Amino acid sequence: MRKKITLACKTCGNRNYTTMKSSASAAERLEVKKYCSTCNSHTAHLETK
């Protein structure tokens, strides 16, 4: 089953993106580099619940 997760900026903490993640195959938290409009640059975004 796929879970809906939120991605938050590591620098400012702003929750910018939502995505789906397979709960069975990925146990660790997701971290991707995406654009943050608050920081006005590409930063690391971490998975939140």
From Swiss-Prot:
Keyword GTP-binding: no
Amino-acid biosynthesis as UniProt keyword: no
GO cellular component: cytoplasm; ribonucleoprotein complex; ribosome
GO biological process: response to antibiotic; translation
Keyword line: Antibiotic resistance, Ribonucleoprotein, Ribosomal protein
UniProt record similarity statement: Belongs to the bacterial ribosomal protein bL33 family.
This protein's name: Large ribosomal subunit protein bL33B
